[in-house]
Amino acid sequence: MINLIITLIINTALSTIIVLIAFWLPQLYLYLEKSSPYECGFDPLGSARLPFSMKFFLIAITFLLFDLEIALLLPLPWAMQLPTPNLTLILAYCLIILLTAGLAYEWIQKGLEWSE
């Protein structure tokens, strides 16, 4: 028991020391290049409040939803090996139907067209 306590104290102390060093070390060496913002090779001269296309935002959110669908359906082959995979299949089909209905709605509302 005493070994566990000593190990926890040493780990906590080392973690605290490393975090403190990480906060103090960058403040010792301030360079103009490090203190200025970097925007993909361009100097930020204009305003940061530039308008963006709402169509681009909606298409990005749609792709994000379908990436989430893939992440949710990836464990499906392992779930099919359960003794009773009926509930898993029903939930997977419900998810696919819900996302297909959402995609059809976006398509009908012309939300996927890029022209403005």
UniProtKB/Swiss-Prot annotation:
Which E.C. number(s) belong to this protein? 7.1.1.2
Q: Name one GO biological process term.
A: mitochondrial electron transport, NADH to ubiquinone
Substrates-to-products reaction catalysed: a ubiquinone + NADH + 5 H(+)(in) = a ubiquinol + NAD(+) + 4 H(+)(out)
Bilayer topology reads: Multi-pass membrane protein
Explain the purpose of this protein: Core subunit of the mitochondrial membrane respiratory chain NADH dehydrogenase (Complex I) which catalyzes electron transfer from NADH through the respiratory chain, using ubiquinone as an electron acceptor. Essential for the catalytic activity of complex I.
How it assembles, according to the record, is: Core subunit of respiratory chain NADH dehydrogenase (Complex I) which is composed of 45 different subunits. Interacts with TMEM186. Interacts with TMEM242.
Tell me what this protein is called.
NADH-ubiquinone oxidoreductase chain 3
Q: Which organism is it from?
A: Osphranter robustus
Species lineage = Eukaryota, Metazoa, Chordata, Craniata, Vertebrata
